[in-house]
Curated annotation (Swiss-Prot):
<dbReference type="GO" id="GO:0000139">
    <property type="term" value="C:Golgi membrane"/>
</dbReference>
<feature type="topological domain" description="Cytoplasmic">
    <location>
        <begin position="204"/>
        <end position="277"/>
    </location>
</feature>
<keyword id="KW-0488">Methylation</keyword>
<dbReference type="GO" id="GO:0043005">
    <property type="term" value="C:neuron projection"/>
</dbReference>
<dbReference type="GO" id="GO:1900079">
    <property type="term" value="P:regulation of arginine biosynthetic process"/>
</dbReference>
<dbReference type="GO" id="GO:0090160">
    <property type="term" value="P:Golgi to lysosome transport"/>
</dbReference>
<keyword id="KW-1133">Transmembrane helix</keyword>
<dbReference type="GO" id="GO:0005886">
    <property type="term" value="C:plasma membrane"/>
</dbReference>
<dbReference type="GO" id="GO:0051493">
    <property type="term" value="P:regulation of cytoskeleton organization"/>
</dbReference>
<feature type="glycosylation site" description="N-linked (GlcNAc...) asparagine">
    <location>
        <position position="71"/>
    </location>
</feature>
<dbReference type="GO" id="GO:0042998">
    <property type="term" value="P:positive regulation of Golgi to plasma membrane protein transport"/>
</dbReference>
<dbReference type="GO" id="GO:1905146">
    <property type="term" value="P:lysosomal protein catabolic process"/>
</dbReference>
<dbReference type="InterPro" id="IPR018460">
    <property type="entry name" value="Battenin_disease_Cln3_subgr"/>
</dbReference>
<dbReference type="GO" id="GO:0008021">
    <property type="term" value="C:synaptic vesicle"/>
</dbReference>
<feature type="glycosylation site" description="N-linked (GlcNAc...) asparagine">
    <location>
        <position position="85"/>
    </location>
</feature>
<feature type="short sequence motif" description="Lysosomal targeting motif. Required for AP1G1, AP2A2 and AP3D1 interaction">
    <location>
        <begin position="253"/>
        <end position="254"/>
    </location>
</feature>
<dbReference type="GO" id="GO:0005783">
    <property type="term" value="C:endoplasmic reticulum"/>
</dbReference>
Length: 438
């Protein structure tokens, strides 16, 4: 059905209206609508995470340089080394890039903590508008910033955009075929790769970072267009076929205590039901927290300390390459659900923690002889993180009832954000400790 009409008729914008469950449609889901929806969710994933990734890619530059006079950005493509701790054996900024990470994640954490309690009462369209406006505001504020403090305010706007968007769109997947989850995950991985690569490529090519950030204003507009004009109205879905067989073979996360029914949203779940569902989700939430804690401790705590002086890349360029390779790994693994499915995500958490331990030892002893070995490890780190994300949400979608799925997807969003927040809090004192070593 048409995009505008679909938006006006969207079931989700009238969540407070109780309607009788409609009959299930035939198993042959309309191919045109299916492709519009999966492409819509891919674009939503891409656009939702784009500003978040760009801010992390620019973290080293944001903390290294203030805006110069005139119309030039405070971030230079190849900045001279300033405000570093010259007494340390590391090439350190005075403030860890974890500060940007915290500005980019703490607002998201607050949003995700509060979302299961009341965000579902707000229709979806206003949430999407808030997300798009905040994303655009983040690019504008950082582009025209004269100080680190103002830039961090722009980073906070990017965090609000990403947090509201992720909770909104993952909850929205409950009303569409389960295939949209893998497409959403692939889109978020694509945001990482395209965001990091675009910032790296445009600044390396000599484009003013101010103009680079302003050129990205088309991304929030694309997100709004994808939601309002590309997605079709959600309809009751019949798992059917392979998905039905796979679901029936799984152990449900919680025992169903209510008669079989499929309400249009989870807004009528009691607090007791929400707590019961959340406890069942811990089997998947805890491993994902560990995965994201380890990888973002590496990314924002160790990346700037993994500095090789015997290469043609300066410190800022090395940091950008690290971010780009990590995001490339995330994109590949978040797009791999159709090829490889992992139920026991604890294995991924263990491997990522081993990754952290190995790189932490290298920061201390500097035994890796080449930056290219670090490149490979960072690519592998991204593969683990992306696989953990997509498989966690896929497993939750399979193992929760239709009645609980919308709430479960929104509640599980806290996993990555909590892990990232903890890593940022611990990376700050580690940075200060290591950078004061003579």
């Amino acid at each position: 059905m048409g995009g505008c009409a679909g938006s006006r008729r969207r079931l989700l914008d009238s969540e407070e209206e109780e309607t009788a469950p409609e009959p299930r449609p035939p198993r042959s889901y309309h191919k045109g609508a299916l492709w519009k929806n999966v492409m819509g969710f891919w674009l939503l994933g891409l656009c939702n995470n784009f500003s978040y990734v760009v801010m992390l890619s620019a973290a080293h530059d944001i903390l290294s340089h203030q805006r110069a006079s005139g119309n030039q950005s405070h971030v230079d493509p190849d900045p001279p080394p300033t405000a570093h701790n010259s007494s340390s054996r590391f090439d350190c900024n005075s403030v860890s890039t974890a500060a940007v990470l915290l500005a980019d994640i703490l607002p998201t954490l607050i949003i995700k903590l509060l979302a299961p309690l009341g965000l579902h009462l707000l229709p979806y369209s206003p949430r999407v508008l808030v997300s798009g406006i905040c994303a655009a505001g983040s690019f504008i504020l950082v582009a025209f910033s004269h100080s680190v403090g103002t830039s961090l305010c722009g980073v906070v706007l990017a965090s609000i955009s990403s947090g509201v968007g992720e909770v909104t769109f993952l909850s929205l997947t409950a009303f569409y075929p389960r295939a949209v989850i893998s497409w959403w995950s692939s889109g978020t991985g694509g945001a990482g790769l395209m965001g990091a690569l675009s910032y790296l490529g445009l600044t390396q090519a000599g484009l003013s970072p101010q103009h680079t950030l302003l050129s990205m204003l088309g991304i929030p507009a694309l997100m709004l267009a994808s939601y309002f004009f590309l997605l079709t109205s959600p309809e009751p879905q019949d798992p059917g076929g392979e998905e039905e067989a796979e679901t029936s073979a799984r152990q449900p996360l919680i025992d169903s205590e209510t008669p079989e029914s499929k309400p249009d949203s989870s807004s009528n779940l009691s607090l007791q039901e929400r707590w019961t569902v959340f406890k069942g989700l811990l089997w998947y939430i805890v491993p994902l927290v560990l995965v994201y804690f380890a990888e973002y401790f590496i990314n924002q705590g160790l990346f700037e300390l993994l500095f090789f002086r015997n290469t043609s890349l300066n410190h800022a360029q090395q940091y950008r390459w690290y971010q780009m390779l990590y995001q490339a790994g995330v994109f590949v693994s978040r797009s791999s659900l159709h090829c490889c499915r992992i139920r026991f995500t604890w294995v991924l958490a263990l491997l990522q923690c081993l990754n952290l331990a190995f790189l932490l030892v290298d920061v201390w002893f500097s035994f890796l002889p080449s930056i290219y070995l670090v490149f490979l490890i960072i690519l592998y780190e991204g593969l683990l993180g992306g696989a953990a994300y997509v498989n966690t949400f896929h497993n939750i979608a399979l193992e929760t009832s239709d009645q609980h799925r919308e709430f479960a997807m929104a509640a599980a969003c806290i996993s990555d954000t909590l892990g990232i927040s903890l890593s940022g809090l611990l990376a700050l004192p580690l940075h200060d400790f290591l950078c004061h070593l003579s």
